[in-house]
Amino acid sequence: MKDRLQELKQRTKEIELSRDSHVSTTETEEQGVFLQQAVIYEREPVAERHLHEIQKLQESINNLADNVQKFGQQQKSLVASMRRFSLLKRESTITKEIKIQAEYINRSLNDLVKEVKKSEVENGPSSVVTRILKSQHAAMFRHFQQIMFIYNDTIAAKQEKCKTFILRQLEVAGKEMSEEDVNDMLHQGKWEVFNESLLTEINITKAQLSEIEQRHKELVNLENQIKDLRDLFIQISLLVEEQGESINNIEMTVNSTKEYVNNTKEKFGLAVKYKKRNPCRVLCCWCCPCCSSK
């Protein structure tokens, strides 16, 4: 009889080697497939483009805040008449930049409102993208509103300074005028107050007259700035009214959610209490002490 033990051992080694190589190949293939996998949500909206626009808009609002701050710092002190022409030129440049930036930000905020409504229709009001857009719009709109209120207060304070300066110069020259007369003069455009007849009527120097004329020009420029921004403030007030309704709806939703959570807590408490008093549970605990110990 032929001894085939060596042949069997050789065959066994070959089978083991082939099995090991097959297992390693399978693991490599599985690992390769796993590395290529990625979690993809086909219906999830992409918010990167919205975030890019929001970041750009936020930078514009920050630049507007810086310009308003510069404008306010220039109004803290009255500059001498020798520097007043250069000051008026700088103020005119800053106010033009503020107007352009404010109009751009206002248009961008309106576009963001349209994106919010579009996201509500496509993704639903409770989707992540919709909530992000709403919160970002509310925060940036509130910041923009505060900046424009500060700018408006600065212009109003500058007007009062100019009126006070004109009244003081006229009092020094011996010409008594009330604040109402100055306001009427500015609104009606009575330029004859600053002509040569006033110079001959009272003892006023040409330097004082030049000071008054410069202050009057500043007031006229401020009036024009306020007229330019009037439409913008009207749009802001309309947006405030719309935001007020949204805030009321959010408050009602939060209150109803709070009541629902409280009711749920009470129901959970009753459920736990009834579970402990369940007679079947007590009977099982007496019959099966091992289960109760677990």
Curated annotation (Swiss-Prot):
Localization per record: Cell membrane; Cytoplasm
Membrane-protein topology: Peripheral membrane protein
Protein name (database record): Syntaxin-19
Family: Belongs to the syntaxin family.
UniProt keyword list: Cell membrane, Coiled coil, Cytoplasm, Membrane, Transport
GO molecular function terms listed in the Swiss-Prot or TrEMBL record: SNAP receptor activity; SNARE binding
Cross-referenced Gene3D superfamilies: 1.20.5.110, 1.20.58.70
Signal peptide: none
Keyword Membrane: yes
t-SNARE coiled-coil homology domain span: 209-271
